[in-house]
Amino acid sequence: MKSVTMNEEMEKKSVTEDPERDVLEIGQMRYNYKREGSPLHVKSYAFAVRIVRMFLHLTGDDAKLMVIYRQVLKSGTSISANVHESEFAQSSSDFVSKLSIALKEANETDYWLTLLHESEYISDDSFVSIQSDCKELIKLLVSIIKTAKGNHNQ
């Protein structure tokens, strides 16, 4: 069993930030923080891009783990999809529900990433980097959900 070290350049390829203009560039896409979403929206999308890149990198390595790789891909990209859906929630309860699903998916993604790391399929450096992003999303989601529930109960 060999540990995969994802090249940081490959992993974060073409991700640049221009804070003066509130723009994040991911590959060919320009993402405007103010126009197109909150920091949670932008960070969850950037995380989904990292998950897709990791999936593409890992699938060429070992087809035996395809089931786990697909689980990481599904849960890791679902976070951003649910955050995106929450922007058009029909009610505050629907908003909390969408973000709660995103939180569950983030927690599941953390599980699969930890499993791959402890099985020595993801290197320490790659794991620490991507898990840090995942934990940051979990903290943001928990905070927003608590605030939204508090506002809803007032």
Task: Please describe what each predicted stretch is.
Residues 1-81, 85, 89-154:
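Short, C-terminally biased terminal segments at protein or domain edges
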